[in-house]
């Protein structure tokens, strides 16, 4: 598995397994809605009244319609990005 997909695959797989409705926003602003039926390295099959094959390079954002648990399907911790930022403020307050 490629390093860049270590979060993407479990996220999409949890959406698929739990049949979570999603809104997918494309880079051109179009909003698609449905459920993730399947996915691979390059595309997501989005099912609504019809199935649509959406190329990942055209996707800006995937927004789940309800909360779901990614960690139940992915047990390894999130890697710390290069530079060591962990989301916490390193500055000390005086």
From Swiss-Prot:
Protein name per UniProt: RNA-binding protein Hfq
Pfam families associated with the record: Hfq
A Gene Ontology biological process term: regulation of RNA stability
PANTHER family referenced in this protein's UniProt entry, alphabetically: RNA-BINDING PROTEIN HFQ (PTHR34772:SF1)
Recorded GO MF terms: RNA binding
The keyword Transmembrane belongs to this UniProt entry's keyword annotation: no
Residue ranges constituting the Sm domain according to the UniProt record: 9-68
Function noted in UniProt: RNA chaperone that binds small regulatory RNA (sRNAs) and mRNAs to facilitate mRNA translational regulation in response to envelope stress, environmental stress and changes in metabolite concentrations. Also binds with high specificity to tRNAs.
Chain positions covered by the region annotation Disordered: 70-94
Family classification: Belongs to the Hfq family.
Tagged with keyword Oxidoreductase: no
Keywords: RNA-binding, Stress response
Species annotation: Shewanella woodyi (strain ATCC 51908 / MS32)
Top-level division of the source organism's lineage: Bacteria
GO cellular component terms, A-Z: cytosol
Subunit structure: Homohexamer.
Alphabetized CDD domains for the sequence: Hfq
């Amino acid at each position: 598995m490629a390093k860049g997909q270590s979060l993407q695959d479990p996220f999409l797989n949890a959406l698929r397994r739990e049949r979570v409705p999603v809104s997918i926003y494309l880079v051109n602003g179009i909003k698609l809605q449905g459920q993730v039926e399947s996915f691979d390295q390059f595309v997501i099959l989005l099912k609504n009244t019809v199935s649509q094959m959406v190329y990942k390079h055209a996707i800006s954002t995937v927004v789940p319609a309800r909360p779901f648990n990614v960690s139940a399907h992915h047990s390894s911790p999130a890697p710390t990005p290069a530079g060591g930022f962990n989301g916490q403020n390193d500055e000390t307050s005086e």
